[in-house]
């Protein structure tokens, strides 16, 4: 479950954001499943005005998992389009993990593109690697990163890309690669059914990751994290499902709607 913050950013960052001006305000809902158990829910509110996008996201753990790993998070992010490129403006997260509070805020100045950030508490450098200031040049937030990816897909281009990401606590490089096209069946009530484009994701940590961890990023494959993009609304490709395979099992995210 330590991957949850990254997964949330990857999947909730993209609904309806891509290229359609007519999608001015939309709500989306996702279930989170681990094995056969529903362990959480995500609600997403997306607002678009002219060339800017704002997201408000609430995620909560649910069921038996809450007894062992109580999690909740409120995320606000905004991006804007300038010179045909989506750029970051704000990425802010208030979260609680096992009743411990975490806050992070990253702000990019629109004029000089420089960033400022604040986190509380500070990184515990006995448990995680430091984030060198020298690595923060030309970074974007996870939401803006996936907006760029989904825009490529909606322009009939492969999702292949490499991006430099910073979310306030973690600095990593994100690589995406188109794997295949796959027809999804609606294996759960209200889940998506139809053709999808499958993109694989690899994450290379550059700071903020745990010093002692079972995660070995050098052994990761693009097939370990899959995002399924389907035409769920207005002929736009949106993330309709996501699968994360790790040593502790498989976590699946499913968009919920009346398809």
Cite the ranges covered by each PLM segment:
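Acidic, serine/threonine-rich low-complexity disordered tracts
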Residues: 21-110, 156-259
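Sec-dependent N-terminal signal peptides
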Residues: 4-13
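Sec/Tat signal peptide C-region and signal peptidase I cleavage site
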Residues: 15-20
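A charged, solvent-exposed segment within the mature domains of Sec-exported extracytoplasmic proteins
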Residues: 112-174
């Amino acid at each position: 479950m330590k991957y949850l913050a990254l997964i949330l950013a990857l999947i909730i960052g993209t609904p309806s954001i891509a290229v359609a001006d007519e999608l001015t305000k939309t709500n989306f809902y996702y279930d989170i499943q681990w094995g056969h158990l529903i362990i959480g829910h995500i609600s997403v509110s997306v607002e678009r005005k002219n060339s800017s996008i704002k997201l408000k996201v609430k995620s909560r753990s649910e069921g038996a998992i809450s007894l062992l790993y109580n999690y909740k998070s409120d995320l606000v992010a905004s991006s804007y389009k300038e010179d045909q490129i989506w750029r970051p403006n704000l990425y802010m997260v208030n979260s609680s993990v096992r009743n411990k509070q975490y806050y992070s805020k990253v702000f990019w100045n629109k004029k000089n593109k420089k960033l400022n950030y604040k986190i509380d508490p500070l990184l515990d450098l006995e448990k995680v690697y430091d984030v060198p200031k020298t690595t923060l040049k030309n970074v974007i937030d996870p939401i803006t990163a996936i907006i760029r990816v989904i825009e490529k897909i909606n322009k009939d281009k492969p999702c292949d890309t490499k991006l430099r990401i910073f979310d306030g606590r973690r600095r990593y490089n994100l690589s995406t690669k188109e794997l295949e096209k796959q027809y999804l069946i609606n294996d759960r009530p209200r889940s998506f059914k139809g053709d999808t484009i499958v993109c694989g994701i690899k994450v290379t940590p550059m700071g903020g990751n745990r010093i002692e961890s079972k995660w070995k990023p050098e052994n990761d494959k693009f097939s370990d994290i899959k995002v399924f993009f389907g035409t769920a609304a207005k002929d736009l490709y949106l993330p309709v499902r996501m699968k994360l395979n790790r040593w502790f099992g498989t976590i699946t995210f499913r968009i919920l709607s009346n398809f």
